[in-house]
């Protein structure tokens, strides 16, 4: 299924992206759910899938984490089932992510899907990432507040909420409506009837993650082996003093590594192309031989990217799931990065190069791409 998003992107980016929340009425016309509540509940029974149940009764909140064995204990009100990265495990839902590729792939994270019964929700809270919340089956009331300093508290160890807030948006969403919320705006949603919601979340690494990730890269490659030296050690009034110029020199030693463009590019490509959630990787058995890949493509078969696989381009280099893809065939690499589905035409002359075919076979045999059907 193909989803057509009714949105003036230039206007949206100028007025709302990372600035102001907005309700996009009928963002998807004639919206059809790509997954049923039963299918979602089935996914939450799988150990590889990240899921949780959130419920509340008389002001008391409960959170439990999957995999779940049964839902028989649940009542008819006040609970939600939330499943992360459903686009990794259920191919039809991945189609919901594609209309949002007007925004950079490296910023898109995953598709979280929730099923809620009347009164179900997770309470008023803040997120530090952008999110588009698509209303599927059913109706849900959403309230969004102004971006202010707000106290957060934990009504349950696994649930972070904010105090009640005054709403700047108070809307009832119907199938196909979309609520966009930038980082830091408090919000809460409660189902008015059995309801499905689809949250396209965006990824924004913080400074701590970046420094930690780069430090891992430095350690793995044994970079930064230069030692501090001070042949012109300056005199000081007290032997315990560390002088400002020494602090500057130490900081420069660290910055020197970050300021090497090739290393920084290689690290960031590996770092940002890794998914934060497990992928449904299923290497083919038996593995494909390069000539089988060639024949299949030439016969018109379509090669499809695994749901949730992050394929990103930095300059001329392409990265997939933390690995750099090496090949001199730039147009073919661009096709891998740009297209979800690929045909022989996308690869062009690269298919006549045995080394490219061997590389493509390795990617398919890793489970990163698969033949449709």
Curated annotation (Swiss-Prot):
EC number(s) per entry: 1.14.11.47
Effect of residue 211 to R: Blocks dimerization. Loss of activity
Gene Ontology BP term (one): post-translational protein modification
One GO molecular-function entry: 2-oxoglutarate-dependent dioxygenase activity
UniProt remark on cofactor binding: Binds 1 Fe(2+) ion per subunit.
Catalysed conversion reaction: L-arginyl-[ribosomal protein uL16] + 2-oxoglutarate + O2 = (3R)-3-hydroxy-L-arginyl-[ribosomal protein uL16] + succinate + CO2
Obligatory cofactor(s): Fe(2+)
Functional note: Growth-regulating oxygenase that catalyzes the hydroxylation of ribosomal protein uL16 on 'Arg-81'.
Organism ancestry: Bacteria, Pseudomonadati, Pseudomonadota, Gammaproteobacteria, Enterobacterales
Organism in which the protein naturally occurs: Escherichia coli (strain K12)
Transmembrane segments: none
Location of the JmjC domain: 92-219
Name of the featured protein: Ribosomal protein uL16 3-hydroxylase
Pfam name, any one: JmjC_2
Summary of subunit composition and partner proteins: Homodimer.
Superkingdom of the source species: Bacteria
Family assignment from sequence similarity: Belongs to the ROX family. RoxA/YcfD subfamily.
